[in-house]
Amino acid sequence: MHTWARVGACGAALTVVMTPVTAVEMTRAAAEAGTIVVLDSDLRRCDFSLISTDPMVAHPGLGTGTAVISHSGSSATAEVHLVDAPEPGTHFDVGLIQEPRPSSATCGPGDPGTAYSGFDTDAAGSGTVTIKEGIRPGTTGVWVIVERANPNSQNPAEFYTSEFVAPVSPS
């Protein structure tokens, strides 16, 4: 009987010691894994404000996507996934945009606080790209825009943006 009591006491002591270690490791793993952000078919301004009157687009946003946003040291990374089955073989431009930024600032390719890349969807309509950018001083978060060019307009033919600004802070 006393043997089982000692085993139980040792097990309880081990649990008390291991719980904080496990919690720290789980938190560290979550930070390294990044923040999962859903991509919505919403058009946004460069300051992340929503454009309430979307431009007429050739095709509605029929795709679905996510971005895994992480930061390490002084850089932010976005791994962007999009599935647009109705439009296989389509090229999309993808931007990683740092916030805050003034509403008057532009956020196209080459603008400060932005990084752009692109991908072509495969035969199933899937595409993935990873973008990495140095975090500028004062940056508190980043968001992603995915857009397909419209040959007949300056407005994109199809677009997806982050549901929220993912927090980052330079180390």
Predicted regions and their residues:
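N-terminal leader/targeting pre-sequences
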Residues: 2-6, 30-171
